[in-house]
Regions:
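Loop-rich catalytic cores of soluble enzymes, especially ATP-dependent carboxylate-amine ligases
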Residues: 40, 154-165, 173, 182-347, ...
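Substrate-recognition/cap regions that form aromatic- and gly/pro-loop-enriched pockets
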Residues: 347-348, 354-442, 446
Length: 545
């Protein structure tokens, strides 16, 4: 059964889709058999194999709340080779990565342990609580991450030099959280068989993952509405550039109804991406678009120059230096061989998992992520997977982009309308409809795990639709007012969280695990640095060959 987007109702399904849920007759799904199959307790158990992981970025700041000028602490290991503690763009921008796990509780628990361990190694520095930085100076004051003398390390550094050259370094100090998600291998044969899908299982898997991604691009605006937590920022972040933001207090600007300035045009965006023909309509179109973008020269970037003698300013003057520069709310991922480009790994082996990139850091929580976020994400992603997902046209992509922009800049505005098939409809109605559509999938997950955690999370989060004051973005605005500025609020949260994390004990086993991993990474870094290296120019050419 083909299905429309939100805002239109289907005729009653003639089959018994999911015998416990008559509401599924209104779902926009492709095959009733899929839902019936996975509603049975025995089949629902396969969903306990869903694999999850978090990546959390956060700035190190000094005791005055300024961007830390110190190098990455040696006590945190090699930022190039440590599996869980690394850096993103800036030397002061930490990134904590949880190993993938099918235990739903593991990512949050492990992320908490990373924070506890790291907070103890920072001395008088703090982990900045918010997504938006504060009190940052000119680009020259923002040091990019330094990874060592090897060609691998230099490649990462030049890439970051290029990002700063193209977009400015201030934008690279914004922090967020990514959610990595995949279905177990045992899930796919069952789904393929009840869908009469392709004989090649990887082709079927790729097609369904890309269908999930397209639906997430349609409905992902619900994430910043429910969880956005960056409605205000320090005036210093704009570095004198004009904006439509209003003054909330001296030194603090905000959008009165904003949910996530991090996801707005002020945040991390790649406007050159508008020139790229990168489509999510199939794996082939997606990888073909990426390949074209890393080989298409851009006059603006060419004018910046790639090299000054031996100094590399960027990896290339193409639309993208590497595939990682492509910005999207969700990306298909595949762990390839060492040195293998992401697009080639996807082409050769197919989609392994998806990376959802829309979570702001919740400044009220010491690890920046609330427990209900993964429960909601599981349910939304499962619904996006099962739901019919036609190709996205350029017109619809414009709608999707506009809806996201409206939600991140004024999502709590009373009466806000979003676009559905060129018609405006109330955000609240569309959000309630999405929650209706997700309810059976929450029940499916609850059947798998034997409790009501998913239904309870959806019920609680649904209240934020009619009561926007319950959203983190609204609560941040109120907290900023109480503290007098965004800086005062974020600094208070940063100090409080760091002190709390330092006071919480790690088990001897966990402490030993981290200590061993630190030493292993430093030893591996020393070995890499000692190896002879060839020409960096040849190294870069080999990567793109």
């Amino acid at each position: 059964m083909c299905a429309p987007r939100l805002g239109r109702k289907l005729p009653h399904c003639s089959r018994t889709c999911f015998r416990h849920y008559d509401t599924l007759a209104m779902l926009k799904f492709t095959c009733c058999n899929q839902l019936r199959q996975f509603s049975e307790p025995a089949q629902a158990q396969v969903l306990t194999g869903i694999v999850r992981g978090f990546e959390r970025e956060c700035l190190r700041v000094d005791h005055d709340g300024l961007l830390a000028k110190t190098p990455h602490p040696n006590a945190l290991g090699s930022k190039l080779l440590h599996p869980w503690i690394t850096t993103d763009y800036a030397e002061a921008l930490l990134e904590f990565i949880t190993p993938p796990s099918s235990d739903p509780a593991f990512p949050m628990a492990f992320l908490k342990d990373i924070h506890r361990f790291s907070a103890r190694q920072l001395g008088s520095e703090y982990l900045w609580a918010g997504s938006m930085p504060c009190k940052i100076g000119p680009d020259a004051d923002i040091a990019i991450a330094h990874y060592g003398p090897s060609n691998t390390a230099r490649f990462k550094e030049v890439y970051r030099e290029g990002l700063g050259l193209r977009y400015g370094r201030a934008m690279q100090t914004i922090a967020g959280a990514h959610y990595n998600w995949s279905l177990p291998e045992a899930f796919w044969p069952v789904m393929r068989d009840c869908c009469n899908g392709e004989s090649n299982l990887q082709d079927f898997t790729n097609r369904r993952y890309f269908g999930l991604i397209r639906n997430f691009l349609r409905f992902g605006w619900l994430i910043p509405y429910l969880f956005g937590a960056s409605p205000a920022l320090c005036k210093s972040f704009l570095q004198g550039k004009p904006s439509d933001l209003r003054e909330l207090s001296p030194g603090t600007l905000h959008g009165p109804y904003a949910t996530s300035l991090r996801m707005s045009d002020l945040g991390y965006q790649n406007h050159a991406q508008d020139q790229m023909a990168i489509s999510f309509n199939s794996l082939q179109e997606y990888t073909r678009g990426l390949e074209a973008a890393i080989r298409t020269h851009d006059p603006y970037y060419a004018d910046m120059g790639v090299r000054d003698g031996e100094h590399w300013k960027q990896l290339s003057d193409c639309l993208l230096q590497t595939e990682s520069e492509f910005y999207a709310a969700m990306r298909p991922k595949r762990i390839g061989l060492h040195g293998e480009r992401p697009a080639l790994a996807l082409q050769r082996y197919g989609v392994q998992y998806v990376e959802m990139r829309l979570f702001d850091l919740n400044p009220f929580i010491d690890i920046g992520i609330a427990p209900e976020q993964s429960l909601f994400a599981d349910t939304l992603l499962l619904m996006c997977l099962f739901r019919d997902s036609p190709p996205i046209t350029s017109r619809e992509q414009g709608e999707n982009d506009e809806n996201k922009l409206r939600v991140v800049t004024r999502g709590r505005q009373p009466g806000l309308q979003l676009l559905v098939h060129n018609r405006e409809q109330p955000l609240r109605s569309l959000a309630h409809e999405l929650f209706d559509d997700m309810a059976p999938f929450a029940a499916m997950l609850d059947a798998a795990y034997g409790d009501q955690r998913y239904a309870t999370a959806l019920r609680d989060l649904r209240q934020r639709i009619g009561e926007p004051d319950r959203t983190p973005s609204a609560q941040v605005i109120e907290a900023v007012k109480q503290h007098g500025s965004y800086f005062n609020f974020a600094m208070e949260m940063s100090k409080s969280h760091s002190q709390k994390l330092q006071a919480e004990a790690l088990s001897q086993e966990t402490q030993a695990q981290f200590t061993a991993s630190i030493q292993t990474s430093l030893h591996a870094q020393a070995e890499l640095d000692a190896q002879p290296k060839g020409s960096f120019e040849d190294f870069v050419a080999g990567y793109f060959a």
